[in-house]
């Protein structure tokens, strides 16, 4: 009888811990395998975030995802000066990936670039690709900064995959690498095409596609040679974002929201 009582108490406590883990408010991206009933040791950066920023202690619940295995519930099992260990209890969500949608853009200044990467990730792009155009004023882009913004946005919005970050590349090279069946949505600031409220209509009239890329140009627009290349490209849809010339970050959000 005593043994049965202890067994019931054990499962009762285990069930309560699982329910606590399931209702966790802290969500963390980790670059490691996630398996039920396993203990994982987090990198020091994660330990610092959980302990010093979030002020979590041993026993605190959290959820984790790695971008391809769904979402998992767990709790902090151990904290030391050098590491933080988490016990994984169970998978609570199956993996769901966003649409195969790329954002190609001429980079802008740092603060607006951070904003663009965050919002693009929140809106579900699968790839963030800064492109070098003839009139681009930025000469260098920090890939790791874009990646950090994409991860933070995914953590906050319950997205389960992470937008891929591609290296800063010339526009013509990007176009050469793009598949022919990927619809290129060219946001042309000088276009006399669809006004802002008809972008969705223009997209519905576009060729059938299951993957696409949205192209946003620099503040100075596209050069004549770039326009010639884009105009002659197969499977390219030129659209207007309205009567006004939008900043690159505003244009990106507008186009993504309409897709």
Regions from the PLM with identified roles:
Residues 224-259:
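Structured adenosyl-cofactor binding patch, chiefly the S-adenosyl-L-methionine
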Residues 191, 219, 243-246:
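Short, acidic/turn-prone active-site loops that include or flank metal/cofactor-
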Residues 171-207:
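A mid-sequence, solvent-exposed acidic-amphipathic segment
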Residues 3-93:
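N-terminal positively charged helical leader segments and presequences
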Residues 33, 91, 133-136, 243-244:
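Short, ordered loop/turn segments at secondary-structure junctions
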Residues 212-229:
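A C-terminal functional module that forms or caps the active site or interfaces directly
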Residues 93-186:
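RNA substrate-binding interface of SAM-dependent RNA methyltransferases
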